[in-house]
Amino acid sequence: MEETPAPRARISEPKLQKKVVKFQTEIEKDVELEAVYEDSLSSGSSLGTVVGFHGSPGSHNDFKYVRNKLDEMGIRFIGINYPGFGNTPGYEGQEHGNPERQNFTNALLDELKIEGKIIFIGHSRGCENALQTAVGMPSHGLVLINPTGFRHHKGIRPVYRLEYLNSLYGILPSFMGNAMMLGIYKAIGFKVQSGEEAINAMRSAMRMSLEDQIEYIEKLNQKNTKKLIIFGGNDHLVEEEIVLEKLEKHDGLEHFRFGDNINEDEKLKIMETFTGNRLGASVFVAKDTHFQNKSQADLVAEACKKMLEA
């Protein structure tokens, strides 16, 4: 008889907060808006804080399974919501490149004045911003879940189709453009609530840094930041070889490959890579999809705890 898997613990509701932030666009235009973010423990944690950067589309809920585990560990989680993705409002003339996204990120984190050890964690598109933030701010750890790479992955190829949709959206009446984008993204299988969210997700995918990430990886290699990079063999958006190219630039990682589940002995070996002077691990799971933020939530949370203890 097959063993019935234990039911997953009930996920608690996110604790959303609001804070007015001021930052500049890429053309140095001043923006002031009310940022909406998740803060699971606003009083702080003596263990440390994990800051999450969502995908496109995405939100703080990208990390709800990880955060639920962090709650049990007493580790604070802050989930950033980028403007225009359904929580933090967008603004006129918004660009979606990393310079502008980082200005927003830095403005919010400066307002929050987080004390103690910090781990930055990204999912998919958000991995670029997690990386840049880990370089620009004091960082104890970095976790990249299903990261994008240095070239366009299959989820956004061919790029000319995205450029065509972006141009078409710009000339259509807003109600028609939004209906078009909402229909396309829902048909693909993305969870979006509006056409505005869909077009912003697409534009942010079009404005990724790609190979320009290399300079940030090289800078991070000069620090003693612990790292975990996880990716899956059944990822329908990002090819394995694209992530492997990225891994070549990260110094000091120990590499693990699994076909299916990771047993406790194997998990302990991964955790050991975050101890002492060791810098961390990359973990490939052949059966996993693009959503290891759910399937490997326990591994990610345990890795964060181990990093904070180091």
Regions found by a protein language model. Name each.
Residues 131, 135, 142-170:
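Flexible "cap/lid" loop of the alpha/beta hydrolase fold
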Residues 254-310:
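Catalytic active-site module of serine/aspartate enzymes centered on a nucleophile-bearing elbow/loop
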Residues 40-87:
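Conserved HGGG/HGGXW glycine-rich cap/lid loop of the alpha/beta-hydrolase fold
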Residues 82-118:
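Active-site loop/oxyanion-hole signature of alpha/beta-hydrolase fold enzymes
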Residues 223, 229-231, 235:
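Short beta-strand/loop motif that positions the catalytic acidic residue
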Residues 234-238, 290-291:
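Acidic catalytic loop of the alpha/beta-hydrolase fold
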Residues 201-219:
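Active-site nucleophile elbow and catalytic-triad environment of alpha/beta-hydrolase enzymes
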Residues 1-50, 72-75, 265-273, 309-310:
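Alpha/beta-hydrolase fold catalytic core
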